From Swiss-Prot:
Binds 1 copper ion per subunit, denoted as copper B. Binds 2 heme b groups per subunit, denoted as high- and low-spin. The gene is ctaD. InterPro entries: Cyt_c_oxase-like_su1_dom, Cyt_c_oxase-like_su1_sf, Cyt_C_Oxase_1, Cyt_c_Oxase_su1_BS, Cyt_c_oxidase_cbb3_su1. This is Cytochrome c oxidase subunit 1. It is a multi-pass membrane protein. One of its GO terms (cellular component) is plasma membrane. Cu cation binds at residues 264, 314-315. Its EC number is 7.1.1.9. Keywords: Cell membrane, Copper, Electron transport, Heme, Hydrogen ion transport, Ion transport, Iron, Membrane, Metal-binding, Respiratory chain, Translocase, Transmembrane, Transmembrane helix, Transport.
Length: 532
């Protein structure tokens, strides 16, 4: 019966999407609707082909979707890093801004593609896959909703990634940082995200373990908060239901405040709380040590959840935002430093008694460096939120360096460690294909991050000082073009750092493939047992 319901639903979706494509008022909308229709048809065929298949045992963990998530995370990571290298060199060498396809490959189109690829494709797939793995293992229960809900979340997320990418390349964007998707794709994100919440929360509800492990607290907080942020920030009235354009519900300073309430907390919950859930599970597992202080992890959780949501106004210092709101954001940001470092200390001290593994285990080394970058970024962020510091750093490349030291160092490195941990276990292999390749990846990525971040710190501070330099009469000394020319050497260094990081990602992709293809198999027990 359920299969027939799915067939009817997919048929209706395909028909509506095909009709919408035929009535489209602009190219991005038409292409997106064609993609949705094709996805629905492919899903319909897949349901037809699998209708008679035996149902999987309810005593086994649902690891198929997690394996797919590992593959997707690796693939989209490479795509995101590759686009990053292209746009880094486009900034250094503007001639690389090609006008092919009506500007499809210039910086303005590729930049949102890059941010979405690394945050929502690479990071999003990593979070979905790891959350599904962790919640099943710590609950000793199969994923709620079975294969249907799990695969809907996974393939729905891939559809969002593909439609977003094509929309950006074709010029479809609403121009909001980290929220460039137009209204019709915003709805798709909300639907898939609610399904993700149901799968995760349902698994916790049917858990066999009485205790809810702290990693699940962080995962759940990130899922719930991102849903709220996404829906409120993207409230809009479409100009036409057959076009991408819409009118935002809020305007002016209210829209700016809502946008950076969303933008900062996309960092705070998507890129921090979610990945802290990853840290609290995979670091103890890889180190084979319990969390240093479980009480500290609880304090860390509640302090972070309360404070982070207030910090958004620090993005709007010296703007039309009321001074009280700006000051409130600054104060909350400075206070946020303390729980953030509590989490960093908890992660690092989990290795107590196992520090020798840093010499022998490059995966642990990667995780430890990621925690170090988390600590550095969560000190630098509150410092940059102070108005006096922000007057120098705002609108400069210092902010870019700060974001990327966190994204590449914290999010990237902990994700790499998670992928190296999961791959042999999910495919039932005796171990990774090559620890030497992991070590190569570690050093290439670390050197790449240092080159990138330090180049942006240097050029950002230089840029801020050049902007504010005045002569004896009070006139500006430097034209804007002078500041751009002065940044050229550091832009090249940034590009080189990006190339090294990309090479590390390619080495990882080969190592993971070789682990599955060339390593001997072992018994792979995916049976629901007391918390692992």
């Amino acid at each position: 019966m359920w299969d027939y319901v799915k067939l009817v639903a997919l048929g209706v979706v395909a028909a509506i999407a095909a009709y919408a494509a035929s009535q489209a008022r602009d190219l991005p909308y038409m292409v997106n609707m064609v993609e949705v229709a094709l996805a629905a048809v492919i899903a319909l065929i897949w349901v037809l082909r699998t209708m008679g298949d035996p149902k999987p045992s309810k005593d086994e963990y649902f690891d198929g979707v997690i394996r797919a998530g590992v593959i997707a995370t690796t693939f989209w990571g490479i795509v995101g890093f590759l686009v990053a290298v292209v746009i880094a060199f486009q900034l250094a060498f503007p001639a690389l801004n090609l006008e092919f396809g009506n500007g499809m490959l210039n910086f303005g189109r590729l930049r949102p593609l890059h941010t979405s690829a690394v945050i929502f494709a690479f990071g999003g797939n990593a979070l979905i896959a790891s959350a599904f793995y962790v919640v099943q293992r710590t609950s000793a229960a199969r994923l709620f909703g079975g294969t249907a809900l799990g695969w809907f979340v996974f393939w729905g997320w891939q559809l969002i990634i593909v439609t977003a990418a094509t929309s950006y390349l074709l010029g479809g964007s609403q121009g909001k940082e980290y929220a460039e998707l137009n209204w019709h794709l915003d709805i798709l994100v909300a639907v898939v995200w609610v399904a993700y919440l149901i799968a995760f929360l349902g698994t916790i509800f049917k858990r066999k373990e009485p205790h809810i492990y702290v990693a699940n607290w962080f995962y759940l907080s990130f899922i719930v908060t991102i849903a709220m942020l996404h829906i409120v920030n993207n409230l809009a009235v479409p100009v036409s239901i057959f076009g991408t354009k819409s009118v935002q519900l809020m305007a002016g300073v209210q829209d700016a405040m809502t946008q950076w309430w969303y933008g900062h907390n996309a960092v705070g919950f998507f890129l921090t709380a979610g990945f802290l859930g990853m840290m609290y599970y995979f670091v103890p597992k890889q180190a084979e040590r319990p969390v240093y202080s479980y009480k500290l992890s609880i304090v860390h959780f509640w302090a972070l959840i309360f404070l982070y949501i207030w910090a958004g106004p620090h993005h709007l210092h010296y703007t039309a935002l009321p001074d009280w709101a700006s000051t409130l954001g600054m104060v909350m940001s400075v206070i946020l430093w303390m729980p953030s470092w509590g989490g960093m200390i908890n992660g690092l001290m989990t290795l107590s008694g196992a520090w020798d593994k840093l010499r022998t285990d490059p995966v642990i080394r990667m995780m430890v460096v990621s925690i170090g970058f988390y600590g550095m970024s969560t000190f630098e962020g509150p410092m940059m939120s102070i108005k006096a510091v922000n007057s120098l750093s705002h609108y400069t490349d210092w902010t870019i360096g700060h974001v990327h030291s966190g994204a590449l160092g914290w999010n990237g490195m902990i994700t790499f460690g998670m992928l190296y941990f999961l791959t042999p276990r999910l495919w039932g292999r005796s171990g990774l294909y090559s620890l030497k390749l992991v070590s190569w990846h570690f050093w290439l990525a670390t050197i790449g991050i240092v080159l990138y971040a330090s180049a942006m710190w240097v050029t950002g501070i230089m840029e801020g000082l050049m902007w504010r330099e005045v002569d004896a009469q009070g006139f500006l000394v430097n034209a804007f073009a002078d500041t751009v020319a002065a940044k050229f050497p550091m832009y090249v260094v940034r590009g080189v750092g990006g190339v090294l990081y990309l090479l590390g990602g390619l080495i990882m992709a080969y190592n993971l493939w070789a682990t599955v293809a060339k390593q001997p198999k072992t018994a792979n027990l995916a049976v629901a047992v007391p918390a692992e």
